[in-house]
């Protein structure tokens, strides 16, 4: 290859040409093929990179600027150098390569600086220009090096420029100009115009200098004629010129760069071709005057597409990549559609590279076919033409404004176009690509016209590829825009192996924009962990492989494609912006692309193919030939490119790796700069770069502005569908095709992606796929390097690429989870887009578009099949399949899409082997093929079990499509729903289910979207995971390591579940589900009941959505609405569901459980009920998989609700969950749900069983029976009988939204497991709602995902003592209401956790209090180890148990899943107030306001039992339960008017107010609270009373004279449930006015408080229960009772108390009276923990009390709180710990402490005992004994961090300091201990100092006067008053500090070494008294 590259005209061209003969490359042989291919590869990526930036940085469109402001253009041209220098400098700052390039090429660098003004352009152009200025060979080498160094720094651009020299710079400029002209076309966008102008100027300036300097150097050296062409056609030709001088390695580099140039040029040429024919006259004119208008006139559809692509590219990439985009000028048109169709953009860029190749050597001009778009450039780019072009670039500078150079370009382009057959077809294409042509004037006329025409021809013909060579032409001409993009991509690809690496960053001037975009996207891909990038790369690579037959092109192609994908995927954060920006860009494009629409339509189609054709353009000629020839060519070229470009490839790989870094910045910038456009791109790219491009193009076709976006989204959706079709087709495809596809994995994926966007891209996609085959192979050689660099370089190019793809895929899947969110914003676009594309009429394929994308793709494929033959389609299918695998996330949708019936399935038959091959490769690529595996396994599964495999793929779609198809769902809102429904249950019969789903989707959403498309959409619908995305990402990462096949299967099961469910419900929901069940069992029958539910939640969640989708899809409006709602609500609700699905997908087991979920949905009602039971059972699962549990509950709820009001409930499953939950009376629509919840709570301590029977009708509690039995209770179980009315599954509890149905009998059956699962929590019901299903699925992480936000009581907050009741409330907590009564607000979505769904049917939904007994196993562990969210979740579970009582009915009612809110209670009526009718006591069942003893606040609740001794068991509305003294119970409900209360506002802060009114809604009481003159309604739970406020009501409303019943001492009010230390809590509250919520976060009443919305709000943070620091108190300060008793609170350090341990606590008077707390039911509760127990000495307590009183933080409240703290009985605590398998350390033993899983010191307060100090020194957490109490009470391990004791009282700060992890405060300290051994001073402090890290401690007995001490070796002397004077004198002489033990103590308390004289007590002779 190097040699050939050296000989542009020589062997490379010939060999490459011969290799590429089959692909339409021959048609464009004006460029040597080998060189073209190689250059194309780099160029392709470069251009793509630039293109992406263009797409993303639409706003900075120099071309637009030029068009808008010709004067400005001139000025900018004048300023080009300075502007470029500025940009270069900017770029320099970011990209060393650029800066070096700048230095190298003065003029070029100036131009680059100009171009750099747009963000992307700057980086790409800067590099390119700089590179151009370098001598050809020098530059190439430099660029290679720079590529390597500047990958991060726009290395691709640099490489391209460097390698291409002037060609490169010109290419960059050409592209820039082209891009500018395209932007000009889009100049409607003023800012774009300015940017475009700037870019145009830059291009001109760069073109001129480049053409003069670099172009002359590079072009003269390499190929003066080509150079001219390169200059004119996007300095791509310059690159070829560079290639010629830079022979050998340089040639390789150059070819890569030239490819980039070519790509840039081809982009321009595409424009040029169009311009030559249509745009030649209009281009400059239109670019400047009527950019958009000319486009339409030239070729409305294609032009529009290209322009839109370019516009978007310009706008998008204009800022950062505008220059690159401009460089891609010709490509840019394609690029413009690429905004919508990012792949297209890549295509556009590739042509530049290819052009560059052509330019590289005169021969290379012929091989332009490699860069088909570039070919036109190549042909006109004859050696003479190159010279002309060289000059032309300068003219271009002027002409872009004038438009004359554009015509020049057009002429050149026409010539070139005529040269290759494609060009003549592109003649038409150029029209389509006229926008590009317009852009071309901005470019150098030469470079622009030549590549543009062939490329345009290609693009134009793409839509209707009927000839094989014409097919290439179609690719070039028919898909000219595509060609433009493809050429860019191809060239980028070819140049990009080296150039892309460079180009990715900077190298690609023309490519820069695209490449920058590509780079950005690529970098984003990198950011996405190459997830999107590889996938995108795969897509683009696949798309571009054909374009870029040379490995380099392929690699570059892939990289740019990936880059675009990356842009789409990586900028998930940006993606939202991008999505919005894309919308804006699309709007802009709409203006500018009104014209472009038609063109873009064609372009979209073309582009997709073009991308494939870019590298495949050479191979495109005949589908089969192309496949084989391309395969061989690609293989050869891969080898050649690999060899030739190995420096480059090493570069490429290196650069590619770096590229992600540089592009990351660029990309990130890009997405941000062009977020709107970027988003569609992101989505598209995420799904598949080619798809993205296609989408963008298609969208412009239909509706340039919106259509593009829509297309992108649609493609995303379509992609999945098509992917399915492709997968199926691939399965059916010949093994050869499969192999091809395998080698073309990315290309296949792209095809898949594109196929989803077949409407515009369908015809393109087949070409693409054929090309992708070639590209795939090329890519394997080159792209793999780049991609591997980006991802993980594979050793072999193919392996590399595949592995990269795999990595990309896996990462994409993981990232997609992340990206899911970002794609989400585009989702709306997608939703709109489907309409737009449908509306727009992608003329030949409008119907197809509207019709299932798969069908569209099929038609397109068929179209292409004619010209390209089935082989092309087969290639496409394999490519798609491969790509599918590569892009697990984004491609999954495609896989789903592809398999649609009647679509491309037949052609894709041969794709099956690629799927398998890709699967094989995928694992390589990604160690954890979770996302990847999904694809590969999906593919394999597809082969083996189509439906399952489809499902599998669909699941990846979940992951991938979450990001990609998520937008697709917006486009295809209905499709999304359909798809999703299908996926969970279509595991077995996924296809049919998918189809069923899709058909409705097709009819409703996409018109043409088949079931697969719908399923994709459906699957994506859950994708809305803005909040869940993070969880998804985290959990994916956590679970993504699940077995690949399992994840796939899970995905399959799961996703199909959604579709199946959708189908099943509409068709034969029960039957289908049942039938599916057997298949699903694959997933996990782990918990047939629970797993079903487990899966059920997700599947049901999805299913409900999907059902709704399938139901609604029947009515497009409804479905759309639902889709939108689902998008929004599902975003929250589906977020968890999707997350669950995704994660399960990654965790094969989990997904399979989801399948079970499908199984659970066997009977919808059963499923719903199952979900309910799952909820109950889910508790146990919840523990393990709280997240899933939540999802399950929500899913179940959604499913159940869905039947009633599928659109509303499911759509707003979150809404429903949140709202319905708290409006539990509301039955699901149409459901008459009779549910009987029997909650049996067995209180071990009381040995009294209170059986509460709550009867619900439609979720409304109609009857409550409380039976009290005095048996020895063993556990709390909940039995739920639910009659679900015929209404769909489980409308059992309307208010639950069918969640009750979930908890119905299934719930009851699951209650046991739930209990087990929640063992500690006891709140199976509430948490169970989500947990049950989780259990089945491997969704431990998911549980975490859905874990309650800590806010509710969160893990730590959740005082286990109330853990049970917490379970119910925590569920609410998990909803976002946690802090407030809001919880109930039905704001499941509020829960950012992705638990939105779950919030609605939170465990309490299931009402599975039953499992209150459930052990703390999963949840318990989660609590301590999991994130706060998980803990919150855990909390939810615990709360459920207690809640079970109070929310017994509530559970059916969804139990205020948001939080234990009054509304829920109100809704539940007596349900909330657990045994409303008490057995025996007249007060039982009364609603009261009672004091939570731990924090002194009064909360609303109900008396459930008369415990005796003046105490009553109270169930608080927030689910907490405890015994309260009668004196602390106020019989005032509602709270009387004009009473001062404390209300928790939505901001989660409590503030005082006055009750001014009451009102009841749905049984929930609301207070009108007046605060500061403003009145606001608060839920009952949000209104509490401070101690003072409550005391005011005691006299009148106190519950009798019970206050005397128990001692008033601190322990008096304390109940086991009130164990949390009030002080800590209160202090917490003090710190933030949050109040009990915060307090709840603190262990004091964390659960309860957290549960209570007020407390919950603060609870969200799950603030630690910090006994010590008053500052930390969040709950409102509780004033009032001060106790003389010493509080465990802060211990004053006033006097040093000997650290010796006191044997016992100072017994507290009420210790005996106070319940100590139960022994843990869970016999392994504390397993793995080692405990040290110590008690505060009397002096500690006195000191603490004095400090509290006197200290700054001292307050009566704190003391009061402490009084409320449960008494500490050391012996009993030891019993509790031992009963829970805890290990008690009798003495501090560091070795033993280290061997334990966790060593804790249990104490009643911070103290000054030896153990306490040793633990402070060693960093062992000191935990309050309340933690033990709470953990035992909840039977679940609480988060000890919420119970941490303070380190102690700081003398210096005069306050109690919190415990902080500390290590070695005495690090390396050499200490001399001197004492007379009083209080064992020497040994004690020696041990403490050594434990604290002291280097050495020497003990010196004061009485040992005869011993001499060498004080000089010590750092400090620690002594006591017994220190001998001699030692003191010696120390004074040595200036050795002499301190007392207090200094050591203070160091321990502060956690670091402190000053020796900071306090008088540090004096050794200080006497405390």
From Swiss-Prot:
<feature type="compositionally biased region" description="Polar residues">
    <location>
        <begin position="614"/>
        <end position="634"/>
    </location>
</feature>
<feature type="modified residue" description="Phosphoserine">
    <location>
        <position position="1213"/>
    </location>
</feature>
<feature type="compositionally biased region" description="Basic and acidic residues">
    <location>
        <begin position="830"/>
        <end position="839"/>
    </location>
</feature>
<feature type="region of interest" description="Disordered">
    <location>
        <begin position="1267"/>
        <end position="1478"/>
    </location>
</feature>
<feature type="region of interest" description="Disordered">
    <location>
        <begin position="927"/>
        <end position="1017"/>
    </location>
</feature>
<feature type="domain" description="BRCT 1">
    <location>
        <begin position="1749"/>
        <end position="1845"/>
    </location>
</feature>
<feature type="modified residue" description="Phosphoserine">
    <location>
        <position position="268"/>
    </location>
</feature>
<dbReference type="GO" id="GO:0045944">
    <property type="term" value="P:positive regulation of transcription by RNA polymerase II"/>
</dbReference>
<dbReference type="GO" id="GO:0006974">
    <property type="term" value="P:DNA damage response"/>
</dbReference>
<feature type="modified residue" description="Phosphoserine">
    <location>
        <position position="1457"/>
    </location>
</feature>
<feature type="compositionally biased region" description="Polar residues">
    <location>
        <begin position="517"/>
        <end position="528"/>
    </location>
</feature>
<feature type="modified residue" description="Phosphoserine">
    <location>
        <position position="1670"/>
    </location>
</feature>
<feature type="compositionally biased region" description="Low complexity">
    <location>
        <begin position="1631"/>
        <end position="1648"/>
    </location>
</feature>
<dbReference type="GO" id="GO:0016604">
    <property type="term" value="C:nuclear body"/>
</dbReference>
<feature type="modified residue" description="Phosphoserine">
    <location>
        <position position="1615"/>
    </location>
</feature>
<feature type="modified residue" description="Phosphoserine">
    <location>
        <position position="1698"/>
    </location>
</feature>
<feature type="region of interest" description="Disordered">
    <location>
        <begin position="754"/>
        <end position="870"/>
    </location>
</feature>
<feature type="modified residue" description="Phosphoserine">
    <location>
        <position position="382"/>
    </location>
</feature>
<feature type="modified residue" description="Phosphoserine">
    <location>
        <position position="1096"/>
    </location>
</feature>
<feature type="modified residue" description="Phosphothreonine">
    <location>
        <position position="305"/>
    </location>
</feature>
<feature type="compositionally biased region" description="Basic and acidic residues">
    <location>
        <begin position="277"/>
        <end position="288"/>
    </location>
</feature>
<feature type="compositionally biased region" description="Basic and acidic residues">
    <location>
        <begin position="407"/>
        <end position="419"/>
    </location>
</feature>
<dbReference type="GO" id="GO:0003684">
    <property type="term" value="F:damaged DNA binding"/>
</dbReference>
<feature type="modified residue" description="Phosphothreonine">
    <location>
        <position position="912"/>
    </location>
</feature>
<feature type="cross-link" description="Glycyl lysine isopeptide (Lys-Gly) (interchain with G-Cter in ubiquitin)">
    <location>
        <position position="1682"/>
    </location>
</feature>
<feature type="modified residue" description="Phosphoserine">
    <location>
        <position position="1459"/>
    </location>
</feature>
<feature type="cross-link" description="Glycyl lysine isopeptide (Lys-Gly) (interchain with G-Cter in SUMO1); alternate">
    <location>
        <position position="1560"/>
    </location>
</feature>
<dbReference type="GO" id="GO:0000781">
    <property type="term" value="C:chromosome, telomeric region"/>
</dbReference>
<feature type="compositionally biased region" description="Low complexity">
    <location>
        <begin position="1295"/>
        <end position="1326"/>
    </location>
</feature>
<feature type="modified residue" description="Phosphoserine">
    <location>
        <position position="464"/>
    </location>
</feature>
<feature type="modified residue" description="Phosphoserine">
    <location>
        <position position="525"/>
    </location>
</feature>
<keyword id="KW-1017">Isopeptide bond</keyword>
<feature type="compositionally biased region" description="Basic and acidic residues">
    <location>
        <begin position="790"/>
        <end position="818"/>
    </location>
</feature>
<feature type="modified residue" description="Phosphoserine">
    <location>
        <position position="965"/>
    </location>
</feature>
<dbReference type="GO" id="GO:0000776">
    <property type="term" value="C:kinetochore"/>
</dbReference>
<dbReference type="Pfam" id="PF18428">
    <property type="entry name" value="BRCT_3"/>
</dbReference>
<dbReference type="InterPro" id="IPR014722">
    <property type="entry name" value="Rib_uL2_dom2"/>
</dbReference>
<feature type="modified residue" description="Phosphoserine">
    <location>
        <position position="631"/>
    </location>
</feature>
<feature type="region of interest" description="Disordered">
    <location>
        <begin position="254"/>
        <end position="337"/>
    </location>
</feature>
<feature type="compositionally biased region" description="Low complexity">
    <location>
        <begin position="1469"/>
        <end position="1478"/>
    </location>
</feature>
<feature type="region of interest" description="Disordered">
    <location>
        <begin position="1"/>
        <end position="24"/>
    </location>
</feature>
<feature type="modified residue" description="Phosphoserine">
    <location>
        <position position="622"/>
    </location>
</feature>
